[in-house]
Each structure stands twice: as structure tokens, then as C-alpha cells.
């Protein structure tokens, strides 16, 4: 799953403290649905997903994006036990929702893109490396039920 150094943890935690979970969550999930349209099939109940502007303005997309990033915030508090932290969510997404685990990787990559947009020069290659390690670890933890 990857080992987080103290520097990784400090880097991730420091940036996370500046993230607007509602804005970044909505943008991250919205971008996932626009860039990878096949992921929309898991969100049939969200109403109008017919265009990029409809998706980005959809209140259900924003609300679920916030929920996703809120759970990521919990993970940041437990970087040494991502698998345990996400055990229930992994079970839900695997057994009940049947989400393709590849989508977790895509979402993590979209989040890294959103953070880069929001934080600009502050999102250095070192910061990106720590965050990429984290989203990869989270994707792996969420996929653990599938193995």
C-alpha cells in the first residue's frame, strides 16, 4: 500500500488544512463524470448529467463530492491504516454498488488535478508526489474487497 514518511504526512496534512472540502469535492466528482463519462452509470439517481455544465452545477454531484472528500479527510488521520479505514466503504462499493475499482484510481488522479489547479505554485512536485502516494493508497484500500 505504500509507506508514508513523516514528511509525506506533514505535506498531506498541511495542504489538507487549506482545502475547501465542499468546493474541491464537487469539482473533483464533477470532473470525473465529465472526463470519464462511463462513470455516470453509478449516479443514475443524480438527475441531469447531460452536459459538463449540468454536471458541474448539479447539487447532488456537489453533495456527494463533499461526502467523498470528507471520507478522505478521515483517511488523512489514519494514513498508516488506510485498509482498515476504508473497509466498510470497500465492502459497500464492491458488494452493493459494484463499482469498477479502476474508478477509484481515476477519482484520485482527478483530485490531484483539482488540487494542482486550486493551489498553483504551492502544489510543488514534492507535494504532488505525497498526494499521489496517498490517493493511490486510498484507491488500493477501496479496492481491497475486490481481491
From Swiss-Prot:
CDD domains: Hb-beta-like. The modification Phosphoserine is found at residues 45, 51, 53, 140, 143-144. Changing residue 39 to P: In Bonheiden; causes severe hereditary hemolytic anemia. GO terms for cellular component: blood microparticle; cytosol; haptoglobin-hemoglobin complex; hemoglobin complex. Heme b binds at residues 64, 93. Residues 3-147 form the Globin domain. GO terms for molecular function: heme binding; hemoglobin alpha binding; metal ion binding; oxygen binding; oxygen carrier activity. The modification Phosphothreonine is found at residue 13. It comes from the Eukaryota. Red blood cells. Changing residue 131 to G: In Poole; unstable. InterPro entries: Globin (IPR000971), Globin-like_sf (IPR009050), Globin/Proto (IPR012292), Hemoglobin_b (IPR002337), Hemoglobin_oxygen_transport (IPR050056). The modification N6-acetyllysine is found at residues 60, 83. Acetylation of Gly-2 converts Hb F to the minor Hb F1. Changing residue 68 to M: In TNCY; hemoglobin Toms River; the side chain of methionine decreases both the affinity of oxygen for binding to the mutant hemoglobin subunit via steric hindrance and the rate at which it does so; the mutant methionine is converted to aspartic acid post-translationally. The modification N-acetylglycine is found at residue 2. It holds the Pfam family Globin. GO terms for biological process: carbon dioxide transport; cellular oxidant detoxification; hydrogen peroxide catabolic process; oxygen transport. Gamma chains make up the fetal hemoglobin F, in combination with alpha chains. Heterotetramer of two alpha chains and two gamma chains in fetal hemoglobin (Hb F). This is Hemoglobin subunit gamma-2. It comes from Homo sapiens. The lineage of its organism: Eukaryota, Metazoa, Chordata, Craniata, Vertebrata.
Amino acid at each position: 500500500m505504500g509507506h508514508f514518511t513523516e514528511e509525506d504526512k506533514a505535506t498531506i496534512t498541511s495542504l489538507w488544512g487549506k482545502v475547501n472540502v465542499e468546493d474541491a469535492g464537487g469539482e473533483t466528482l464533477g470532473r470525473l463524470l465529465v472526463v470519464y463519462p462511463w462513470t455516470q452509470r453509478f449516479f443514475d439517481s443524480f438527475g441531469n448529467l447531460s452536459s459538463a455544465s449540468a454536471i458541474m452545477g448539479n447539487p447532488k454531484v456537489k453533495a456527494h463530492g463533499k461526502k467523498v472528500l470528507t471520507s478522505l479527510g478521515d483517511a488523512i488521520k489514519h494514513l498508516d491504516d488506510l485498509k482498515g479505514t476504508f473497509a466498510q466503504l470497500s465492502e459497500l462499493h464492491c458488494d452493493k454498488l459494484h463499482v469498477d475499482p479502476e474508478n477509484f484510481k481515476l477519482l484520485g488522479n482527478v483530485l490531484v488535478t483539482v488540487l494542482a489547479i486550486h493551489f498553483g505554485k504551492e502544489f510543488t512536485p514534492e507535494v504532488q508526489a505525497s498526494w499521489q502516494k496517498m490517493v493511490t493508497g486510498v484507491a488500493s484500500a477501496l479496492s481491497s474487497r475486490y481481491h
